[in-house]
C-alpha cells in the first residue's frame, strides 16, 4: 500500500524481459504491465513468499504450478491461476478502498511534475503516461 518499489516492478519485464517484453522507452503497454504486475505481486506477497519467486513463476509453468500446489496444500482447497489473480485483485481493491476512505484521490497517484518535464539521461525521455491512462491501472 502506498509507494512500494516492488509493486508493479516493471523493470523485470522492461529490462530483463521476464514475463514478457515491453519497450521501457515507450509508454505503450506500461499501464497494463504495471497493473498485471501489481496483481501478481499482491498475490505472491499474500502467500508469504518473497517477490523473488515471481521471476521464476512468471516464466516457468512448472514453477507456477508448484506455487498453486503449495497454496492448495496450505489452504486445503484447490487453487487455480484465476484464484491467484483474484487474490491479488482483492488485495489491491481493499488497499484502494482503504486509501479512498482515508481521503486519497486519483491526484495522489500522480508523479511529481518534474518527471513529466525534465528529460532523463541518457535517453532524454520523460514520463509520458497520461493521467487518464494512469487511472486505468486500478481497473482490475
Show the residue positions of the predicted features.
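Extended C-terminal regions of large enzymes
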Residues: 1-140
Amino acid at each position: 500500500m502506498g509507494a512500494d518499489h516492488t509493486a508493479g516492478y516493471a523493470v523485470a519485464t522492461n529490462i530483463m524481459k521476464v514475463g514478457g517484453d515491453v519497450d521501457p522507452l515507450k509508454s505503450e503497454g506500461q499501464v497494463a504491465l504495471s497493473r498485471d504486475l501489481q496483481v501478481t505481486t499482491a498475490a505472491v506477497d499474500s502467500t508469504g513468499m518473497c517477490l523473488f519467486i515471481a521471476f521464476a513463476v512468471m516464466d516457468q509453468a512448472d514453477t507456477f504450478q508448484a506455487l498453486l500446489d503449495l497454496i492448495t496444500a496450505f489452504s486445503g482447497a484447490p487453487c487455480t491461476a484465476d484464484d491467484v489473480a483474484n487474490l491479488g485483485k482483492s488485495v489491491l481493491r481493499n488497499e484502494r478502498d482503504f486509501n479512498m476512505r482515508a481521503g486519497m484521490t486519483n491526484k495522489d497517484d500522480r508523479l511529481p511534475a518534474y518527471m513529466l518535464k525534465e528529460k532523463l539521461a541518457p535517453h532524454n525521455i520523460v514520463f509520458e503516461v497520461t493521467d487518464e491512462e494512469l487511472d486505468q491501472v486500478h481497473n482490475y
